[in-house]
């Protein structure tokens, strides 16, 4: 069970945290990561692209010339694919690209991504992130203090509009959330928009202490 230092927004060490091997110390499975990233990217597609076939373009109802005796190749319509302004052969049509992953694969992919960040020393644990006002300068300073200027990904333990909007003008910065809550019938649920693609596409992954503890609670054995 690795132990990581916990820093404040100025990058100074303020404590330690024990990370579970079940979440941050597993083997990095590139095959599962590939499956998860492919599914995520496919699910972002709208699938609305469309082309017209020869039956959908206007015109072409008349045979351009008689079948034999002209010296030309025989043609039945000026809207066949080989003609200018003709229909498209085998073109795309609207369809769903959605790929569904089972819970076991999603869980394994997220654990693998987190373990990879930890092994690459691209994981930072921050005690808490509090802003008194909207301040992009403060967030840029925090990213610099933890050496995460390039494409940082921040995972908060609550929805904080000040932090979200303060990071909006930071190039490449991504803000996600992972915390526990209750639904309308009082059941405990996990609220999260953390995904494997964002983790792999980021530079350093910055977790608040509470978010890291909740992730270990949910995904630890």
Regions found by a protein language model. Name each.
Residues 33-68:
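A short, flexible low-complexity segment enriched in Lys/Arg and Gly/Pro that occurs
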Residues 54-90:
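Glycine/serine-rich anion-binding loops at beta->alpha junctions
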């Amino acid at each position: 069970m690795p132990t990581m230092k916990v820093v404040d927004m100025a990058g100074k060490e303020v404590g330690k945290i024990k990370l579970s091997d079940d979440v941050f110390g597993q083997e990095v499975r590139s095959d599962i990561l590939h499956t998860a990233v492919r599914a995520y990217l496919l699910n972002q597609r709208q699938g609305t692209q469309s082309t017209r076939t020869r039956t959908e373009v206007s015109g072409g109802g008349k045979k351009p010339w008689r079948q034999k005796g002209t010296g030309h190749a025989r043609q039945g319509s000026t809207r066949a694919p080989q003609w200018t302004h003709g229909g498209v052969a085998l073109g795309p049509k609207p369809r769903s690209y959605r790929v569904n992953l089972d819970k076991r694969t999603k869980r394994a992919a997220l654990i693998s991504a987190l373990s990879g960040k930890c092994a690459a020393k691209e994981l930072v644990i921050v005690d808490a992130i509090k802003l008194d006002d909207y301040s992009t300068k403060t967030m840029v300073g925090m990213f610099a203090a933890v050496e995460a200027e390039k494409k940082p990904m921040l995972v908060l333990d609550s929805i904080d509009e000040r932090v979200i909007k303060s990071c909006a003008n930071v190039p490449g910065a991504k803000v996600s959330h992972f915390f526990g809550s209750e639904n309308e019938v009082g059941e405990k649920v996990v609220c999260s928009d953390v995904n494997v693609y964002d983790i792999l596409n980021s530079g350093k992954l910055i977790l608040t202490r509470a978010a890291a503890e909740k992730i270990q609670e949910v995904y630890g054995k």
